[in-house]
Amino acid sequence: MMSETKFEDLKISNDFMFKEVMKSNKGLCKRLVGSIMQQDIEDIVYIETEKTLQPYYDSRGIRLDVILADENHTRYNLEMQARNVISKAGVALLPKRTRYYQSVIDMDMLKQGENFDQLNPLVLIFICTFDFYKEGRYVYTFKSRCLENLELELANDVTVKLVNAKGKHGQVNTLLKNFLRYVMTNEPVDDFTEDVERQVWAVKNDKKAREEYMVLQAKIREHEIVAYEAGEAQGHATGLAEGLAEGEAKKSRETAIKMLKKQKPLSEIKEFTDMSEEEIVRLAKENGLEVING
């Protein structure tokens, strides 16, 4: 199970704290989005202050809190990713996570009776404390393009930006560089990061935020316990099934040995024990017995 961070120890690199800071200070949020997009944003409006796909964290661990729009109606979702989550199958989940976010936000934008041409431009921003593609870039920007001609863009107005806090190169502004350094070190280095740090402490002194975090952690623990117990039950069931199968196989081998000693024909042993010819021949060889064909 995941270790729990105390509320007073939360840093900006924690997703809960990051979202609380972005939601509670419009000016900081606007400046950060503008620095990532490398454009001046005059104003932002919070579309949903708590767009939770299922109460708190579901099995995917997804909680969409910071959804906003600028003066041009472009929508943004801000997310802090402190872990590169890998599935049991060994697949990194971040790319599929972006697809899931897009589908949920798009469905939310499409009101009943409206056409799909009402979809506003969407930018999904993931600030990561790890370099997902290991190329050292500050920002990886993705749009849909034609593989046969990369100059052709599928103009679906969806952009995904993976912002790498460990980045070393790329054309980004100083404000973003300093913010990413602050994310990794927790040490403010300019006026902007000092303002962010002050807002972090303001959140820590907010009783409501503390209560929300405690409820969130309780929900996460509950989910982990249920998942653990389900895994235990599945393990017991699997072990029981394997044990029964092994018992039946052992009984078949013992029966085959007795029949081999009585020089019963191979076809009869095969039919009686459901063992293959290869298994019976190998068993006979292991026990120094003769196989009677027929």
Where are each of the predicted segments found?
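Conserved single-residue anchors adjacent to enzymatic active/cofactor-binding motifs
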Residues: 1-208, 294
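Short, charged alpha-helical interaction segments and adjacent helix-coil junctions
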Residues: 2-8, 12, 76-81, 167, ...
